[in-house]
């Protein structure tokens, strides 16, 4: 059985410059898994959704911002996040709104003899639960068992996480478009599967933050959304 290389991305948040830099760095791969939040915060929602559609990922699931843009429900969102959602709703083309509306909230599949589970938040709350780095291992194990998988892939926190629990793994690729771990570079994960064997590598990629931030400043959204790109938080 030939091995499989999967590119895992998440939390692009309408940041076209970051997404393009990540795509340029990917090299060869067999599949792309996108763990949600294509839109929100950033200045290029249509361009990002178009780019993802063009890539034809094997897995694309909805994040909480994607759901909020489709539904209009921003309950629980901060004021700056809600303003970005409202602007995105006014800006998004109908074809891209329909694409987001059709995204599932999770994906389960088997590859290379391993069961994979993809959620934006968690198996218990696919859109909204945060599973941060440092979460106790017994909690992570309970999530893996709840999902019935060998490898659990999550997004939402914008913080990379790779936890190896022997034959079970919890992975978060971090955020392409708005990292929050103190490193402003775009973040994604390379996952290599080969007949039950697992290897993974986190990659950080420089991108044109100035351009992404300037475009945000030209939109009717809070200035903070541009500033935080430089902070990585």
Regions found by a protein language model. Give the residues of each.
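Core catalytic region of metal-dependent phosphoesterases/phosphodiesterases
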Residues: 2-101
């Amino acid at each position: 059985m030939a091995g499989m290389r999967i590119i895992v991305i998440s939390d692009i948040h309408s940041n076209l410059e970051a997404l393009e830099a990540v795509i340029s760095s990917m090299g060869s791969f067999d599949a792309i898994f996108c763990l949600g939040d294509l839109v929100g915060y950033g200045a290029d929602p249509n361009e990002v959704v178009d780019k993802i559609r063009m890539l034809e990922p094997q897995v694309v699931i909805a994040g909480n911002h994607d759901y909020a843009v489709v539904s209009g429900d921003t309950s629980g969102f901060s004021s700056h996040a809600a303003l970005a959602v409202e602007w995105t709703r006014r800006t998004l083309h109908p074809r891209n709104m329909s694409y987001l509306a059709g995204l599932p909230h999770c994906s389960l599949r088997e590859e290379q003899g391993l069961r994979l589970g993809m959620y934006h938040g968690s198996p218990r709350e696919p859109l909204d639960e945060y599973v941060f780095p440092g979460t106790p291992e017994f909690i992570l194990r309970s999530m893996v068992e709840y999902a019935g998988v060998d490898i659990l892939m999550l997004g939402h926190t914008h913080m990379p996480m790779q936890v190896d629990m022997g034959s079970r793994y919890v992975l978060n690729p971090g955020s392409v478009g708005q990292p929050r771990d103190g490193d402003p570079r775009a973040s994604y994960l390379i996952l290599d599967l080969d007949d039950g064997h697992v290897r993974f590598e986190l990659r950080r990629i420089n991108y044109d933050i100035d351009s992404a931030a300037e475009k945000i400043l030209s939109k009717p959204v809070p200035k903070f959304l541009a500033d935080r790109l430089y902070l990585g938080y």
